[in-house]
Amino acid sequence: MYKINPNDLNLTDKVVHISRVAKVVKGGRRFSFSALVVVGDGNGCVGYGLGKANEVPEAIRKGVEQAKKNLIKVPIVEGHTIPYEVLGHFGAGRVLIKPASAGTGVIAGGAARAVFEAAGLHNVLSKCLGSNNPHNVVKAAFNGLAQLRSPEEIMARRGVTE
């Protein structure tokens, strides 16, 4: 898969999950934050990143920078959905993603919905199977979207002209 230059795209970011973690030290608890962020151009390019810092805005900024380094291209058919059904895996999390007819909308749970909206998918059905942890769901959704190939790409690979 080729590298996508984030500077050429008009990316929007969406915070999926913010987590506060504590390190226990002699004087008490030391708090830190991690932010799971999804970025996308709404036209087939989408990425995710995890930022960690002592303050929330800094964690989000780091997450966005990480997400820009992790962009994938999603094939969108008929201007609104994916070409075929796919199952993405990550850890114990699995996400089933199905194409939907026009007017259906994005039917997905919180973390997966953010990924599909950032990618520019307007009609898609999805179901989280197994783990509902936002990190696993986002990574499983990405795994599923990364497996997708456009109909033209599949025809070229098989040597079919029409």
Swiss-Prot record:
Keyword Transcription: no
A biological process from GO: translation
GO CC term (a single one): cytosolic small ribosomal subunit
Ribosomal protein keyword on record: yes
Keywords: Ribonucleoprotein, Ribosomal protein, RNA-binding, rRNA-binding
Record InterPro entries: Ribosomal_Su5_D2-typ_SF, Ribosomal_uS5, Ribosomal_uS5_bac-type, Ribosomal_uS5_C, Ribosomal_uS5_N, Ribosomal_uS5_N_CS, Ribsml_uS5_D2-typ_fold_subgr
GO MF annotations in UniProt: rRNA binding; structural constituent of ribosome
Pfam family for this entry, one: Ribosomal_S5_C
Residue span, S5 DRBM domain: 11-74
Chain ranges passing through the membrane: none
Domain description: The N-terminal domain interacts with the head of the 30S subunit; the C-terminal domain interacts with the body and contacts protein S4. The interaction surface between S4 and S5 is involved in control of translational fidelity.
Family per similarity comment: Belongs to the universal ribosomal protein uS5 family.
Subunit relationships: Part of the 30S ribosomal subunit. Contacts proteins S4 and S8.
Function: With S4 and S12 plays an important role in translational accuracy.
Protein name: Small ribosomal subunit protein uS5
Organism: Geobacter sulfurreducens (strain ATCC 51573 / DSM 12127 / PCA)
Encoding gene (name): rpsE
